[in-house]
């Protein structure tokens, strides 16, 4: 079994096992395995065209995989139709019926054979109250804002009490302020109901703020599956490091010994043993902009780089300082770094463009990655 679908008792409520999906000669998904616990909120994150929506559609039964299987509640549903999978689905386009009022739209997915009209109306109103738009029950979709329509689509998906909720970029068509509000609302509703949820998004902030764990996909391959914190502080490869947050990469490096790296004329200390596998080999060193420190005194005498300030960008709560690394003996290298400083720190340091600025790269903040042959 793939390491990403193992846990203490070996069971997940939703499991995707070794899924491969082809469209002709194009591989949309390649041997992807993911496990989701009951009640967990998981985001699938990646750039456009990476295969994340294809994964959701395979889980939903809207696309048939070429190989692999989908398990829900310990049952193989790989060949089951959509109707037998007990899913609620919210699409990016909302897919509301324009000629049916809001309460009618929400009722639509509730089984007419199992529930009376009164029961269906009661359940629909309960869901509208949950999403906070019960006062709009008798209006039509065209009379509602985009954010309200998205909440109707969510209420409709939840009305039949699905075992799993699938969200396909549900917030991408909304403006930024509404997106931020609905992020919190969707998570509140999910936690209230305890429904297992999988959300597809290309927005990293959306994924990191909403999900318990995040699946990162690129070119149809699973790049990492971890908590938002783990993705940010311990990315497993350069793709995840670059895609999640902002990252500086120093490519012209070679392993020196188990605890240090050559960067041109500089020696960079790492955590003990971190460089063990890179001795004499090319390596990429990475560090977050907020982890770079300005040298204020002589108390630090290692991992110091000479730099020149090329540009200062104000970004509200912080400044981003664009730096160019200098050789120890003088002259500029081709290496550039971004450093983030809070406004208070920036004001106290009096940093200006074109000034030389010594910086410190803390060993515990340096990440090391294998450099692919032919790549910088």
Outline where the language-model segments fall.
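Non-catalytic connector elements of ABC transporters
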Residues: 247, 256-376
